[in-house]
Amino acid sequence: MGNTVIEKIIRHNTGKDVKPGDIVTVNVDRVMIHDIFIPFVGDKFEEMGFTKLWDPDKVVLIYDHLVPASQLDDTRHFHVGDAFAAKYGMTHVHRSDGICHQLMTEAGYVKPGDVAFGTDSHTTTYGCVGAFSSGIGYTEMASILGTGTMWILSLIHI
């Protein structure tokens, strides 16, 4: 059986052939953080001791889950996110520009062959443009922000 699209993307990204069940460290092309998770990502990033983003141009912060704010605490997420973006030089910050996953593909942040992660389970929708993508938690996102890498498990063929 030939390689799957995901295996081809991983091979292009890492320069290594993978087989089902392999754990591989990939170089991340793009990440998306949405407004609900930014306070947790920011806290964990600094707790891990990172002092700069691996590549601010590859990080996208999108305010969409809490827009418009329905509770006073929602606005805290906006203030924390704006402060984090300013402190670490993030230039891709979107406020009320649309649903995060549609924006990531329609604005060209994610392209065919990319490896992308986001703080939402629907991040897998980036496969619609031929990318490998996965939703992750705030600890994994904080680690990516500092290192630019992430481990993945090559899936078993069915």
Which ranges hold each PLM region?
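Conserved small/polar residues in nucleotide/adenosyl-binding loops
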Residues: 156-158
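Short, flexible turn/loop "capping" segments at secondary-structure junctions
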Residues: 18-19, 152-154
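N-terminal amphipathic, basic-rich helices that act as targeting or association modules
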Residues: 1-54
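Class I SAM-dependent methyltransferase SAM-binding "motif I" and its flanking Rossmann-like core
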Residues: 142-152
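Long, structured ligand/cofactor-binding scaffold of large enzymes
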Residues: 31-143
